[in-house]
Each structure stands twice: as structure tokens, then as C-alpha cells.
Amino acid sequence: MDNYKLQLQEFFDQAPDNDDPNFEHQTPNLLAHQKKGIQWMINREKNGRPNGGVLADDMGLGKTLSVLMLIAKNNSLQLKTLIVCPLSLINHWVTENKKHDLNFNILKYYKSLDADTVEHYHIVVTTYDVLLAHFKLIKQNKQSSLFSTRWHRVVLDEAHIIKNCKTGVHNAACALTATNRWCITGTPIHNKHWDMYSMINFLQCRPFNNPRVWKMLNKNNDSTNRIKSIIKKIVLKRDKSEISSNIPKHTVEYVHVNFNEEEKTLYDKLKCESEEAYVKAVAARENENALSRLQQMQHVLWLILKLRQICCHPYLAMHGKNILETNDCFKMDYMSSKCKRVLDLVDDILNTSNDKIILVSQWVEYLKIFENFFKQKNIATLMYTGQLKVEDRILAETTFNDAANTQHRILLLSIKCGGVGLNLIGGNHIVMLEPHWNPQIELQAQDRISRMGQTKNTYVYKMLNVEDNSIEKYIKQRQDKKIAFVNTVFEETLLNYEDIKKFFNL
């Protein structure tokens, strides 16, 4: 316990910030919030316990440039930085380096890498997949320069990717050797406090990186306030409204949809089937083996997925074909209630402005349904999904953002691709075609249009089936609770070192 007490005291008694008075003049082209953020990062590396932290500004506020300017404060070849990011973001780091004339030697690392190669670069940028592959190599006692190099700084971009501390990619990130460690993410917490623990573990934030200590902090009453007192020390999070009153207005509205008679019959019957399957799965807990119980619960989850898809278009839930006498609604060209509402909304925007629109879904097949509808109306669209090669995604992004290109005013976006570093400020309307269980993933997609450089007011339309027994209504209720929890965690708190020490009976 004495060791914990010492670590607690070191964490809370960190040296005060000591800003460089000349920094303002050295960085005239940065915005005020970026200058403040970089000063905070410099102080964390000098005096922080741990050395580093979490830069969690809203998406679109220039976190990439802030990190590059931090590196520029001391760009010696001996003080190397490793940046780990999704594959789609590697070129973004290189582009930002060129755009701001920083002249770093940047190595984009995909394949083999040796120590001699690393010596010639200020920055090595690699992917989470490559990091994990090399982690497996060292577990087999093979060589990897990613892990044999002592980095001056390791930066995890889109760091929420390691939020599950039981995964290999989390363990790989924690195994890197570095003097300073940084997590960059606009959404550090998605669902629960343990999302934050994964970053605290990577940062080596003692004593809280000990899972037993973190578990104790999450016990009993006031756990959120205890977590907040720690987060306040190591996380810098600003939202767009704090940064500037001049940012374009951002409007979010729900667009309600009801079933037609045919869709409602299909949905109600499948919901009854789902309820029966759930009752059967619960009963199996006592009477059948573990494998059988697991299979039955997986079937229930599959049926819930089909309910969600029927709320969008019956074609996505072909399982229901044997429920109705007619199969017309299962055809791809069937105009579902939600599709009609979306198309009316899009037509209105196209006909009353020169704005561009993004349609977002979890299902590529749903996007293809809309692609087909727009083709029938002679409206050109762009597609951006994980099925595209990286160069094709870049082309779609560039084409959509080109103000001179008035032919392609609609982009069909897979939500899995829409949350990671993508810049779509060429558009200013986003239609979320269905709710996602994780509201943070929705927010990431929405921020593709609401970010630095956007000059127009932005609009988000959330399509929601509002039938009494709608699975979409239930998902929205869950979303509201999760968002309220995340907001609570990042509010100000009055707890301090003495409060935490008392909690541990130190």
C-alpha cells in the first residue's frame, strides 16, 4: 500500500504547467486552441506522471497538426516518433506534413523494417494490423524494430481502437518501449469506464493501470467522480462550441418513419418469433449444454438483427420471405417506407440548394439499394465502403470534396469507414439511415462534415422508425443513456488527491 500511496502522490502532485512565452510567436499560423493544446502536451512530456496523455478534442479540430507541431519542438533524428493509425490515415499524416512545410522524414511502414532503415527518419507511421503482426513475431522470439527501438514518443491515432484491454492489439501497443506516450481520439469512452482503462494502461499511468486499483475505483457510490478526477489530469478534451463562436451552425433532427401495412405485418410476426426464440434460449440455460445455449442465443441476436433490417428495407431480411403471402416487399426495387422518406428528403435538398449530401448505413447492401434508386432517377452517386481499395476511397473523397464537381452531390458511406479520419467537408448534409447501438460511432460519422474548414451550416437527419414496438426506438433509448454517461464523465469534478487516498484507506 505504501507503493500505491507514493504513486498516487506523484500523480496528483505533478509540477505546474510552465508555458514557453515565446511559443505564441514561434507558431503564428496556429489557432488559439491548438497553441494551448500543444503547450499542454509539451508540459505533459516535461512534467507529467505519466509522460504523455490523451488529446481528445472533438473530431475536426486539428489534432493531427497539433501532434506534428509537438514533434517539431525537437525534431532530432535521435528522438524518433512512432505513429500507429488505421491504414486509411497513413497518407493523412504525410499530407499534413507537406501541407505545413514541416519537412519531417516520414517512413510509411507496411512490410519489413530494420534498425538501419529507422535511423534515417524522424517519424515512422504504421498501422494497428502491422503492429499486431510484429507483436506476434516477438512472441515467437523473432526480431522486430518496432519493438526493439526505444521510441522518444509513441502516438496512437484513433486510440479507441485499443479500448478492449483483452485484445492482441491492446497488448501490442502496451508492449512498445517509449519515453512519451500519447492517445489521440475524439471518443475516448464509448460505453463504460473500462474503455478509459485501456488507455490508462497504455500510458502506464500508475497506480491506475493496475486492474485491481481500477476495479476498486469503479466500486460503490461516486465512482464516476473518482474517475473524473483522474481523467482531468491526463485528458485534454474541448468541443467545437468551446473553441469558437464563429463555427457554422450544426443542427441535428430526427425524421420519424412508420411502417406501411405490409411491413408492419412482417415486423410483428418476426418479433413474435424472436420473443419465442428468446424464451426458449433462457429455458435452455438449465436443461441443455453450454454449446446449445450459445447457439440458441446467437439465433436470438440474429433475429434482432433482422428486425433492425426490416425497419429499413425487407430485402435486407430475406429470412422473412416465408412469413408473408406476397414476396414483393423483398425485392431490391421495392420502395420501403423509410426509403421513400429518405428519397423525399434528398430530393428536397437537391432541388432547393447546391449542397451535397452523405447517406450513412451499417449495411453496404442498403447503400446499394439507394444507389439503384438514384440510378433510376439519373442521379450520379459516389460509394465509400470497406470493399473499395484505398486509392479508390481517396478518389471518392477527393471527387466529393471538389466544389467544382457538381455532378456528384451524393455520397453513400459505410459507417465502418466513416469514423476514422475521413474529411467530407464538401458536403454539409448527413442522413443517418438507421441508429447504431454505439452512439459514439454515429457521432464520428457526423463529424465528417462538421470540422475545421467547413464554411456552411451542417445538418444531420436521423431516420427513426417510431412504431410502438420498434427496435429502433429501443436503440435510441439505449443511445441516450450512453451519451449521458459519457458526458457525465467529462464534467468538472471537485475530487482531489486526499479524496482518492481516503477511498483507498491509505
Swiss-Prot record:
- UniProt binding sites for ATP: 56-64
Q: Which SMART domains match?
A: DEXDc (SM00487), HELICc (SM00490)
- One BP annotation, GO: DNA repair
Gene Ontology molecular function: any one: helicase activity
What keywords is this UniProt entry annotated with? ATP-binding, Helicase, Hydrolase, Nucleotide-binding
Name the Enzyme Commission number(s) assigned to this protein.
Answer: 3.6.4.-
| UniProt keyword annotation of Ligase present | no
- Broad EC category: hydrolase
Q: Does the keyword Hydrolase apply?
A: yes
Which family is this sequence assigned to? Answer: Belongs to the SNF2/RAD54 helicase family.
- The entry's protein name is Probable global transactivator
What is the native source organism of this protein? Autographa californica nuclear polyhedrosis virus
What gene is behind this protein? GTA
